[in-house]
Regions:
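A short core secondary-structure module
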Residues: 71, 75-121
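Alpha-helical transition-metal enzyme core signature, strongest for iron centers
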Residues: 11, 38, 178, 182, ...
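Glycine-rich beta->alpha junctions and the first turn(s) of the following alpha-helix
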Residues: 118-220
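A short, Trp-centered hydrophobic/proline-enriched beta-strand micro-motif
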Residues: 41-49, 93
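A structural signal for short hydrophobic beta-strand segments in well-ordered beta-sheet cores
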Residues: 63-66
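Internal helix-loop-helix
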Residues: 1-32, 36-41, 83-89, 216, ...
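Short Gly/Pro-enriched turn/cap motifs at secondary-structure boundaries
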Residues: 53-56, 80-83, 98-100, 124-131
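Alpha-helical scaffold segments that form or flank carboxylate-/histidine-based iron centers
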Residues: 204-211, 236-248
């Protein structure tokens, strides 16, 4: 994308989170079914992780998936499901065994949000927006072929996906970093506070922009390097958590300068 000067794809749970997980853990059938549509932007995914009683302690989730012939029968609820009301499919953590330690009885399922028995309620935020939702499942039938990886071993997949999610969030801190971008920091500074020759006379502002750009570029290259290392390692890396923190702070700096 960068080599042909194409704009980055829109924020996508499919591209940034689920796609890499399917490449690593999915069956060939699952890859053929979902990856082309993800790449073409034809399908929107949401994430079924957090529950009313399982947020920070994600492994305490209680949404139940019971085997019934060739499918699972799903019952439970998720919360803070981003854009569930606009999504086509969901990747969801469910409990398939209640008689083992909580980290060992979790499975990773994919299913259509148009399935019978799903109810979505947007959560009204103080800002007036409603990108987060409550999602309820009542006897939702999910084909067993939609199980990613091995039954009861979904916690490993869940952690891997969270690693990709943290890298995605971290990368937001360096977005809009291209000089060619119409709304890049440099172009906005030239337009709003630039002189007739479009040069920015404010030395302090120029210094802030330069320092941000240096950190952003270094961070972007570091993310690339670690992403390459992730492909050859089966263990989740703690660096993704560090990157999420640094990327969030970097994004705050960007917003403060733009204001």
């Amino acid at each position: 994308m960068e080599r042909i000067s194409a704009r980055p794809p829109l924020l996508s749970f499919g591209i940034d989170m689920l796609g890499p997980v399917l490449l690593e853990f999915g069956t060939e059938s699952q890859k053929r079914e979902h990856l082309p549509r993800i790449a073409r932007g034809e399908i929107r995914w949401c994430q079924g992780y957090s529950e009313p009683g399982a947020g920070s302690d994600l492994a305490g989730l209680q949404t139940r998936a019971t085997e019934k012939g060739d499918h699972y029968l799903l019952n439970g609820a998720k919360i803070w499901t981003s854009f569930a009301h606009l999504s086509d499919w969901i990747f969801c953590l469910v409990r398939t065994d209640f008689d083992v330690p909580k980290h060992e009885g979790i499975s990773f399922l994919l299913f259509d949000m148009a399935s019978k028995g799903i109810q979505v309620k947007p959560i009204q935020l103080i800002s007036g927006s409603s990108q987060f939702c409550e999602t309820f499942f009542e006897n939702v039938q999910v084909p067993k072929t939609n199980l990613v990886g091995v039954k009861n071993e979904g916690w490993k997949i869940a952690k891997r996906l969270l690693q990709h999610e943290r890298n995605m969030v971290a990368g937001m801190g360096s977005r809009g970093n291209s000089r060619k971008a119409r709304y890049s920091m440099e172009n906005q500074a030239k337009f709003y506070v630039g002189e007739k020759d479009h040069k920015v006379a404010d030395h302090a502002l120029r210094d802030k922009i330069t320092r941000y750009k240096m950190k952003s570029q270094a961070f972007r290259l570091t993310l690339k390097r670690v992403s390459s290392e992730t492909k050859v390692s089966s263990n989740p890396s703690p660096t993704s958590s560090i990157f999420k923190y640094f990327g969030t702070e970097l994004n705050k700096v960007r917003c403060e300068i733009m204001m």
